[in-house]
C-alpha cells in the first residue's frame, strides 16, 4: 500500500510540473485503473466544445515507472491535435520536451 501511495504522489507531482511548464488548453486528470498495459491517454470533447484529457495509470506501479508513464502519456496529449495516438515524429519531439523537464535536463 505504501508503494501505491508513493506512486500516486509522484504521478501528481509530475503532472503538476508538466501542466505548468508545457500547458495544454484544457484540464488533465489522472485516473487509476486495472489495465493490461501501463497507461493510456484520451483527449475528449463534449458537445459544447469543452475539452479535457485523462491519463489512466495501471494500479500497482512503482513511483519511477509512474513517472515514466505520465511523461509518455502527457506527450500523447501534447501531440494529440497533430497525429492522435501515434508514436510518430511529432510525439517524439513532445516526449523529448516532457522528459527534459521531468528529468531535470533543462
Question: Residues of each region from the PLM?
Answer:
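Active-site-proximal or metal-binding-adjacent scaffold patches in catalytic folds
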Residues: 1-68, 77-106
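Walker B catalytic acidic pair
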Residues: 73
Amino acid at each position: 500500500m505504501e508503494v501505491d501511495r508513493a506512486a500516486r504522489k509522484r504521478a501528481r507531482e509530475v503532472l503538476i510540473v508538466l501542466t505548468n511548464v508545457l500547458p495544454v488548453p484544457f484540464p488533465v486528470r489522472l485516473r487509476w485503473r486495472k489495465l493490461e498495459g501501463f497507461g493510456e491517454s484520451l483527449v475528449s470533447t463534449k458537445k459544447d466544445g469543452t475539452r479535457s484529457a485523462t491519463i489512466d495509470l495501471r494500479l500497482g506501479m512503482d513511483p519511477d515507472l509512474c513517472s515514466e508513464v505520465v511523461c509518455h502519456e502527457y506527450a500523447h496529449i501534447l501531440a494529440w491535435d497533430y497525429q492522435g495516438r501515434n508514436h510518430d515524429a511529432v510525439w517524439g519531439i513532445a516526449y523529448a520536451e516532457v522528459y527534459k523537464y521531468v528529468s531535470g535536463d533543462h
